[in-house]
Amino acid sequence: RALDRSDPARSLDALWDGVELRVDLGAVDGRPFVNNASFGVYAEIVSSPAYRDDKAATVLKLLPDLLTGHSGPRLVAHIGANAVEEPQAVLVSNNSYGTSDLAGLSRRDRLDRGVLGVVTLSVSNTREAVDLLRLNNVRGLTQTTAREVIVEADTPEIPVGVDGESLLLRTPVRCTVHPGALRVLVPRDRPGVRVAAPVFDWVRLWRTAFPS
């Protein structure tokens, strides 16, 4: 599932006619992750009991309110040689999601580019939060790639979501990428890379999920 297999039963073909691929692994303080590590508001969402049952709906429901009401530790994200001061949310992924995906809800086209994808969100009110979800508030958004991300805080420990698991880690927290570290056996006869999904319309998705 973590590698986006829509038909797990077909993976059994790899046992008798498989091809080995190498994909990257992320790591947070040495703990490996295939998908992402989340900080700030993102980590609060991962700790929600509803998250495991419906990831997308939980993100859509909680993200705007958490962004504007966040009162957790003050974070500083060191992304390569650059620093983002006091973002409310930081998402570090094993390779990048699409530019319209601010919360790791979509697929990644590749897992072998040897980089971390990084998203940070910073808003000061509800209007800015909605504009950010519409991708109109680019000043509150950082999207980039790096080989290393270090997250500092004004507390000795911070919540971190690692591939959907909620953890408490000592600061600073260091995220790295290990190119080609994971060997994956896949069927020789398999689908190609899927066409990228259309641009996320966060506001439309929110209204569809919560029409009231």
Give names to the regions the model predicted.
Residues 53-81:
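Accessory alpha-helical/coil subdomains and C-terminal extensions
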Residues 71-112:
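Oxyanion-binding "anion nests"
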